[in-house]
Amino acid sequence: MDTFKRWLNKPKADDKSLLARFFHADRSLTAVASELDSFDGRAEPDRCTRLVSRLRQNQDKVLAITNLIMEELLGEDRDPRAFRAKFPEEVLQENLAGQLWFGAECLAAGSSIMNRETESKEMRPLAQAVTKSLGNVRVLLRDQCLKNNVPNSKTLHLDLNDSTTEQLYESLKIFDRLFAEFELSYVSAMVQVKSRHEYEMQQWIGVLFSETLQRALKIGLLDQEMVDAFDPGLMFSIPRLAIVAGLVVYAKGPLNMDMPGDQLSEMFRPFRTILIKIRDLLRNLNNQELYQLEKLLCTNEDINTKVPLGSSSIEAPSPEHSSHPTTSSSQNNNNSSNNNHSSSSTNTTSTTTTTAGTTNTHRTVERLVDQRNNNHNSNSNSSTNPTVEAATLRSPSMLSLSATSTPTASPAPSPTPSHSIASTSSAATSSTNPPADWSDGDDEDEDDDDIDVDEEDIESSDDGTDEEQLLKDIVSADCASGYLIPNTNLGNLLQPQEVPLTDNFVASEDDEYGTAEQQGHQGLEEDEPSTSAAMLAATRTLQRLRLPSSDNEPLAEPTTIKASEEHMQQPSGRHRDSHSHRHHQRHHHHHHHRHPHQHQHRQPHPHRTTRSGRKRCSLEAADPERIQPDREQNLASGDTSAASSLSDDVSLAMRNTTARLKFKSTENLLHRLFVCIAGVADQLQTNFASDLRQILRSVFLMNMSTAQEEIDIPEKTKESELFEFRASENDVIQESAGSNQSIYSAEEVNPELDNVFSAGGGNQATGQRHSAGASMQRNNTIDLASQPGEGSPSGATTATSRSHVTRSRSLGDQEAASSATSSTAQLRQLEQQQQQQQLQIQLQRQRNNSVGSNTPSSASSTSSSSEQNSPVSARSGSRRRLQSNNETQMPSSATSTSATLSPPAWIPDGKAPRCMACQTPFTAFRRRHHCRNCGGVFCGVCSNASAPLPKYGLTKAVRVCRDCYVREVRSGMGVQGVQSVQSVQASAS
């Protein structure tokens, strides 16, 4: 009996209820699956492929109907799917559910996703649970289809007291939860799904892009018109400028290269190494050079900078970036010495270059020290040196390079009476080491050859001075590298037990003269550097390195610095392999054939033990033992944090300065930066196109100017500009086939043939069309002759009032003026009735007028006054009256045509994805059509009717939908009957 009931309740094929649709879809899916299992797919691959395609289509249909059933039964109890916001746009497709089901069955059967073996193994238990739960749901739904189906019901009619209904409810909840978990896992394994941190970083990048655009608009790099017009060039300019701004201007933003790599956005994470190099080079640019680089990134114009490298101070802009490029005026003038002691080096240009470089290092550190002192002494006046004032306004990492640092500079006088000096590369190399290793960082085995390109050619010579003169020159200056350690006094600097601080820039006298055997080998063939080029500057710096709290402490009197005597008697077989200057090391490398035994016993840091005993800065005081505790106390003080801070700044200064020295000119540097920055930005366009489009779309919407609706009063146009060209339907179909744009109706093809352009009387059109942009203005003029008073003579000129009805029709906006209200329609109907009565009275008066009357009729009121007064007017009076009689035979039609309403606004194409009548989706071949009566969007089948619309001034047949056609035809028949009766009455009168 139960089987008979099931057979009786079996859904029919034309049943549209949810359960019936599921029953037939599931039955079709089962048939395809059975056929697919009935043969070997490898033997018949074509048939297998065809059946698999049908299988996936049926799976999509079954899951879609199941989803509708869950929406109705579960409602708010459905598992949330907010994670879909993380999915890319291309993933969210209509057949996503079918793909997930197919993937779950493949994983449950033991297959693995290609190149995702680990993820496949983790998802396999979940996939098996999904397929099992879905099979249970299908069985329960089929049972409900045979028991509780109501044919053609829009809702489900289940028995709530039945246990199977409750079981179905719980099974649907379990399946919904499992399917949501599998969807997240499967899509995350196939495509990259952003985390919460990544979304936050992407929002910060959007803010950076917006701030960059506003800054570019402020300094004149871009125009607001480009933003409003969505200029495609901005898609390339904004990311390039954002890289510069994120590295220099907003250095603590999302492009902060100091943060760990895993915290950077995935967009810039692959370019972290090159971005760090770009940042180091950008910090060497001044405001003018930075502006030229940004302009180059926007316009791709040639670089106008022809000045050599270092002609202006090189500084990175502070976060308060100047809105206009200004030439930096922080030129360092060295006024400490007037002596011109020309060195007798064989390479004068190289010597001068290295002299300037070392001097610049001292100047840089002086500025940093002055800044530190100014920060500690808030009540003290700022330094009188303009260079120091400029440095205090900037970040400590924003340093300056003097104008004399160009490799092509001419020989300049030495600022101090000094001998040939060491290269700045030693200081630059030591800057890459920790602050504690400033004195020994030059003895590493690895050499940065690409930085020190021409260092092998730098040699120095001695000017022949004796030992006493050398000692006089280096009094209190042989510890010159001590200025790298801030917040210290001479007691700290002269610590003999600590690592000596004289390796970076200055060589001691034992390096100059060495032992007797070393002098025998090198006496006349090698000249070694003896002193630094900025010893006096270092002496002044030492005075500023003391803490404010230590100013009252008794300062030990500096005396001459001499080497220890016991280390002057070193064995001859032990070479000075701890020399601080790299070019000196390379000098030994060039003479390696003379001393093959000297580099065999090289220690990792041998000078830590040898130089501390062989050479130290000693203080000739009365009681050295009494000063020792003071020095240890000072070293144990809490000044190490400030010392490391300033050491880091100096290290950054050395690295940036040396990096810039690789480039021959500013033009070369800017060109290299342009290539690197443009390369990174263009890679973003390729690798992260979707994210970049989304960010740029938000930036454009945030920064575009507010739209101001300007009402343009059209001027009188020429006859050739009266009409705009509009493409016909054939032109639109032939030229833009495949697009989803609307097809223009037949009325728009030849609008000049419409009667809406003719006036109420006369055979000449008085209405004019004015086009402004994409809109068209139609001015329809109605002449209303006021009824003269009873006492007025018959020949008196009647007063004419004009009522202008303007109708705006737009091709681009597809929006027109709002429809007239019902009160306005009633008022116009009364005006039409009054006008008909006036025309009848006027016709009667024209019949009573004499032939020679000069009073023109209302129909010929458009003629000029010269025509009325001419002799021809008398002879043509009868002809004019005949024309007026013919024109007044249909007064109602003329007035009804001219008194038109505004057409309804068209619904935009983007807001109508389906036909508003049959709900069929539009495609490239199923085009959109607008009804001219209601403004709705319909397909070609639902809008294949055409009818005239006199109320809108459209007397020719235009496209309308079926509903409007039935309504307009019925109303049109009634209006035409009334108009015919009125015309007959007018002709009879």
Swiss-Prot record:
Protein name: Lateral signaling target protein 2 homolog
Feature: compositional bias, Acidic residues: 439-466
Ranges of biased composition (kind: Low complexity): 324-362, 374-385, 395-409, 417-436, 635-647, 816-874, 891-904
Family (UniProt): Belongs to the lst-2 family.
Zn-finger region bounds: FYVE-type: 909-969
GO biological process, one term: negative regulation of epidermal growth factor receptor signaling pathway
Gene3D superfamilies membership: Zinc/RING finger domain, C3HC4 (zinc finger) (3.30.40.10)
UniProt feature, compositional bias: Basic residues: 576-616
Residues at which Zn(2+) 2 binds: 931, 934, 961, 964
Function noted in UniProt: Negative regulator of epidermal growth factor receptor (EGFR) signaling.
Composition bias type Polar residues, residue spans: 765-784, 794-811
Region (Disordered): 308-466, 544-647, 754-905
Positions with a binding annotation for Zn(2+) 1: 915, 918, 939, 942
Gene Ontology MF terms in the entry: zinc ion binding
Listed InterPro entries: FYVE_LST2, LST-2, Znf_FYVE, Znf_FYVE-rel, Znf_FYVE_PHD, Znf_RING/FYVE/PHD
GO cellular component: early endosome membrane
Keywords assigned by UniProt, alphabetized: Metal-binding, Phosphoprotein, Zinc, Zinc-finger
